[in-house]
Design a protein with these regions (language model features):
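Class I S-adenosyl-L-methionine-dependent methyltransferase catalytic core
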Residues: 1-294
Length: 294
């Protein structure tokens, strides 16, 4: 498809023109992955996208690591069809469920921390024009996954970025310090079952790999898994390639299909290493895309 073919659909920034007369293309009867036309399909295949999260209520802000509902809508819209079932084993406050509801998909979310699960339940109960089923499980996903009775069409999730939330990164103006000063959570919980409290990197990866092997068992064949994650920097300045290490491990069971970058152009910059050492301002996440092929 050429740029000329898309000229009546996208504006100069590559975004949909906001008119009722837009030609969104034709739906292909052989498309058994999603409900998109070719013109809608091609938009998603760009390897990066900027997401700016919507404003959130106080209870949602308390969770220290959320991803945007718009991201959920894009990924769920591409990897599922209407009425399909989506799984999120690290649900947090329910962004995946909210995005699934707006897209007409059913979803199950699993969350270890009770107060976050309660927020997700409240969000799931909000009225919607889409009559979907949204289920919240306040459990450890290592226990819950083996008890699920259905197979899922897709899994979208964002696990803890190792123990990053326990470590303050930067000086007085770091995000960690800002949340601390506002009385917001700076880590998920104090539970020994919380993966974010594992201090040994290899042990953390081992536990994470086991969980996604359990996810493999409840995914339908040909179903996709998307893991939103980052490479991280330790307190002593070493980069841990968490995203790449996880991709390598899961690629032994799943087919690693691609990565898509979630870019944050509204994240404030900090002058962390000045004037003696390089420390980057990380403003992107990896959305690792895997496929189950038996």
């Amino acid at each position: 498809m050429t740029d000329e073919d898309l000229s009546d659909f996208l504006d100069s920034d590559g975004l949909p023109n906001n008119t009722e007369d837009v030609d969104i293309g034709n739906y292909h009867e052989g498309n058994d992955l999603n409900d998109l036309t070719g013109k809608e399909w091609i938009k998603f295949t760009k390897s990066w996208k900027i997401y700016r999260p919507r404003s959130r209520g106080q209870s949602e802000k308390d969770h220290p690591a959320k991803f945007p509902e718009e991201l959920v809508e894009d990924f769920v819209g591409f990897f599922t069809q209407e009425d399909d079932w989506v799984l999120d084993p690290f649900m947090g406050t329910g962004s995946t469920l909210v995005g699934c509801r707006s897209m007409g998909r059913n979803a199950v979310g699993i969350e270890l921390t009770e107060k976050y699960a309660d927020v997700a339940k409240d969000r799931a109960r909000q009225q919607s024009l889409n009559p979907v089923q949204l289920e919240v499980m306040n459990e450890d996903c290592r226990d819950a996954l083996s008890n699920l009775e259905r197979k899922f069409d897709y899994c979208l999730t964002s696990p803890p970025y190792w123990n990053m939330l326990k470590k303050s990164r930067g000086g007085v103006e770091s995000e960690h310090k800002k949340r601390e000063n506002e009385g917001l959570d700076t880590k998920y919980s104090d539970s020994k079952r919380d993966l974010g409290n594992i201090d040994d990197y290899e042990e953390f990866l081992d536990e994470l790999e086991k969980i996604f092997l359990d996810v493999y068992d409840v995914l339908k064949n040909e179903g996709y898994l998307t893991v939103v994650i980052q490479n991280i920097r330790t307190e002593d300045g070493e980069m841990k390639p968490l995203a790449w290490d996880l991709a390598s491990r899961l690629g032994e069971t799943y087919v690693l299909k691609q990565e898509k970058l979630w870019l944050q152009d509204d994240k404030p910059l900090g002058i962390w290493g000045y004037p003696s050492e390089y420390v980057s301002n990380v403003a992107h996440h990896y959305c690792l895309i895997f496929k189950k092929v038996e």
